[in-house]
Regions:
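Extracytoplasmic catalytic/substrate-binding loops of multi-pass membrane glycan-assembly enzymes
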Residues: 24-40, 44-66, 78
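Short hydrophobic alpha-helices at membrane interfaces in multi-pass membrane enzymes
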Residues: 143-169, 196-205, 343-350
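Perimembrane helix-loop-helix junctions
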Residues: 146, 152, 180-216, 273-279
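Transmembrane-helix signature of polytopic, membrane-embedded enzymes
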Residues: 94-122
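Membrane-interface alpha helices of multi-pass inner-membrane proteins
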Residues: 124, 146, 158-175, 181-186, ...
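Short acidic/glycine- and proline-prone juxtamembrane loop motifs at membrane-interface regions
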Residues: 128-137
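Membrane-interface transmembrane helices that cradle and orient dolichyl/undecaprenyl
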Residues: 105-110, 141-160, 194-195, 328-340
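Extracytoplasmic
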Residues: 222, 407-563
Length: 563
């Protein structure tokens, strides 16, 4: 390793550490809060597929365990958000070590550490807790790596078992990942040279057994399957946040988004072709590899412009991911390795595309802000780059190192500098305040989020809502107002705390089904002391005409109606 490469390694490691520290302390809201409140409900005793009607509730098991452990040690939830981020970072680090070991031992990569560093800087969203998007990425990684170990380390059955268990956990994290099972079985069938049926049955049987055990628990708990089916039906029909995520209109938008990626990728490839053919005059045998390398570098530059210059926020486009996946397929056809190594890496790339398809099925976001979920495919693509045919091994090693270093630096900037885009908080330099109390104590956010959070907490201390039946009414999508439930460990009286929550006659149905969940206190979001929901909204009519409150506690950002 040259002195220059050592310096580059040092810079990338330092940047990775700083980016990881940033993820511990910056930002708070939306999906992160959603995951935490689901786990809070678990700990409070709200039953899954019973009292809970959140569409992502099967993903809550990791956060629930870590939150339970934290409360056991500290006696409360103050600062639990940063603790969960630390736990998520530790899990991510351990998986990065696994990636390093597989890259070094099984794929004989000279850049195994850099590959692991790339993985460490992958984040589907701007959050590091064990949240469903992160969990999907982690368990998909384990699924693929267990499959790699099975084929490249002696076809030991324990790796097939691990593969099936990891896929089962991935489905819990993101139920639409069930699409991965037929794809995985097809990969096993294509790669295996013997015992194809046995290997497929082993993985499928592990998944089936896991599913039967999981569903069987709820059937035994409820004394039959009818209650579970009814609850799943209500979850599907009551989830207002995802009402618009099905149907032809949604897929038309996704196809339009795919067209945007196609145009960007085509334009970048044309530029890369001109650079290599006209300016560098590359030989025909090396032309396609050089075009792919150049295209990846250009895409990294374009993405950095969107992040740093245009301030678009983390989620937007992720052009480097799309181009790297296309480049990875190109590297496969330019490779020199015999199967199963190359085919397994190609399967990893295509598997991330299947993952992205599964995410598109359930998400209420468009493809332009969802492509980061396919980032794991870049790890398999860079490993395929090592297998490409070259004339000068030393020159190729330098090119691969440079390619991986630029890609890693791009990921570090995305992870460490940007934020999830909002009105005035799209990068760390726009940080203006800190959350001082409660579960998110220590988190650094924009001014409005911090002001509302801190002042509401201070008001909360003037009333006693310990174990009260509380309904929080909020119309703000990005503000973490469901965290109010945790300020005094109140019982949640909404069937689903997905953001945005919906308030209509379904609440009456829920309270009739579960009378113990009828609210004693309703906290209504306010602006300048006035309720944000209009007087014509169903929930405000219910509060003022039917709730029979006996006391009102008012403040600038919230109004409490108390029985």
């Amino acid at each position: 390793m040259s002195k220059k490469e050592k310096w580059i390694y040092g810079i990338l490691v330092a940047g990775s550490v700083l980016a990881a520290l940033k993820m511990l302390f910056w930002g708070y809201g939306l999906d992160e809060e959603y995951q935490i409140i689901m786990s809070y409900r678990n700990i409070k005793g709200d039953t899954m597929f019973g009292l809970m009607h959140e569409s992502h509730q099967t993903s809550s098991f990791l956060c629930t365990f870590f939150m339970w452990l934290y409360r056991l040690i500290t006696g409360g939830y103050t600062g639990v958000v940063i603790w969960l981020r630390f736990c998520g970072t530790l899990i991510h680090l351990l998986l990065s070590v696994f990636v390093y070991r597989v890259a070094k031992k099984d794929f004989k990569s000279d850049n195994a550490f850099l590959v692991a560093l790339i993985y460490f800087n992958l984040v589907p969203k701007q959050m590091m807790i064990p949240e469903f998007a992160n969990m999907q990425m982690w368990f998909f990684t384990l699924t693929v790596l267990c499959l790699v170990k099975y084929f490249l380390a002696g076809e030991k059955k324990r790796y097939l078992t691990g593969c099936g268990l990891a896929l089962s956990l991935e489905v819990l994290a993101y139920p639409s990942m069930v699409l991965q099972l037929p794809f995985l079985l097809a990969v096993i069938w294509l790669v295996a040279e013997r015992q194809k049926v046995r290997a497929c049955v082993h993985v499928a049987g592990t998944c089936l057994a896991s599913a039967l055990l999981y569903v069987g628990y709820f059937v035994l708990r409820d004394g039959g399957i009818s209650g579970l089916i009814a609850t799943v039906g209500r979850i599907a029909t009551w989830d207002g946040a995802h009402d618009g995520t099905t149907g032809g209109a949604k897929w038309l938008i996704i196809l339009q988004n795919a067209g945007v990626y196609l145009l960007w990728t085509a334009a970048i490839c044309v530029v890369a072709f001109l650079v290599n053919k006209v300016i560098l005059k590359k030989e025909k045998e090396l032309l396609f590899v050089s075009i792919a390398d150049c295209a990846v570098l250009i895409s990294c530059g374009v993405q950095l412009i969107f992040w740093v210059v245009l301030n678009r926020g983390y989620e937007y486009l992720h052009l480097h991911v799309a181009v790297m996946l296309v480049a990875g397929v190109n590297y496969y056809f330019c490779g020199k390795r015999e199967k199963p190594e190359r085919l397994l890496l190609l399967a990893g790339i295509l598997g991330t595309v299947v993952s992205l398809l599964g995410i598109c099925i359930l998400t209420n976001l468009n493809l332009l802000v969802s492509t980061a979920h396919a980032g794991v495919g870049m790890v398999f693509a860079v490993l395929l780059r090592n297998s490409c045919i070259v004339h000068d091994e030393d020159d190729n090693r330098k090119k691969v190192f440079a390619l991986l270093a630029v890609l890693c630096l791009t990921l570090i900037v995305g992870k460490g500098y940007t934020m999830r885009q909002s009105r005035d908080f799209s990068n760390v330099l726009e940080s203006k305040a800190r959350l001082l109390y409660g579960p998110a104590a220590g988190c650094i956010t924009d001014f409005d989020t911090a002001q509302i959070y801190n002042r509401v907490y201070e008001m909360w201390e003037t009333v006693d809502l310990q174990d009260a039946n509380l309904l929080v009414v909020s119309e703000s999508v990005n503000s973490p107002m469901n965290t109010w439930y945790m300020f005094d460990e109140s019982s949640i009286c909404h069937y689903s705390i997905i953001n945005p929550s919906f308030y209509d006659e379904r609440l009456l149905t829920y309270w009739k089904m579960f009378p113990a969940k009828a609210p004693d206190v309703i906290a209504v979001e306010c602006s300048e002391g006035q309720p944000v929901p209009g007087a014509d909204k169903w929930i405000m009519k219910y509060v003022t005409e039917e709730f029979d409150y006996t006391q009102i506690v008012e403040s600038y950002f919230v109004r409490l109606y108390m029985r």
